[in-house]
A protein has these predicted regions:
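Active-site microenvironments in enzyme catalytic cores
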Residues: 1-11, 17, 31, 38-165
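Short, surface-exposed terminal/edge motifs of secreted or surface/virion proteins that either
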Residues: 12-26
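A hydrophobic, small-residue-rich beta->alpha segment in the mid-to-C-terminal subdomain
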Residues: 23-36
Length: 165
């Protein structure tokens, strides 16, 4: 199942992406909130409802109205927090070397992350660049993991239970 956040006119919505089309989940089931944050706060019950709707649309059981005029947003447009992790050793070593810094000795010992600006999350579309900063840009692959329920000091064996997507 692929969930999307999108905007029609001035309102943000939560949808499911099926076979190249977006369908509003709240229109299919009024118990599902019409935004990603409230949906994620609803936990597994809402996730299960959304999966059933997605399967019903895919299987032709539910004839849902497709959204036609929309703007895609970031999947979670207003996250409550955001962390960025150091994932690729080669990239970190190269970036540090370019700044004349030694590699972080603890890199291989435990996960390294930092808190980043959760208000800077953007969806697809035009990106405004600052030309005077091009020499300092550091391009890299980014991946997101959306946590769907509260937890603290979660062991690796239980981590998948906390991932919403």
């Amino acid at each position: 199942m692929k969930l999307v956040s999108y905007k029609t006119e001035e309102s943000e919505h939560l949808g499911v992406f099926v076979d190249g089309h977006i369908y509003n989940l709240n229109s299919c089931d009024k118990l599902i909130p019409d935004n990603m944050n409230a949906f994620l706060a609803g936990g597994e019950e809402l996730m299960d409802r959304a999966k059933k709707i997605s399967a019903s649309i895919k299987g032709g059981i539910l004839a849902a109205k497709e959204e036609i005029f929309f703007e895609l947003l970031a999947p979670v447009p207003h996250p409550s927090s955001c962390r960025d992790g150091y994932a690729f050793r080669q990239h970190v070593a190269s970036a540090r070397r370019n700044r004349k810094l030694d590699m972080i000795p603890e890199f291989d010992s435990y996960p390294i992350f930092y808190f980043t600006n959760h208000n800077a999350i953007q969806g697809p579309g035009e990106i405004t660049c600052m030309p005077d900063h091009f020499e300092k840009l550091d391009f890299e692959l980014e991946a997101a993991v959306v946590i769907g329920k509260k937890g603290r000091n979660i062991c690796a064996a239980e981590a998948d239970d906390y991932i919403a997507g």
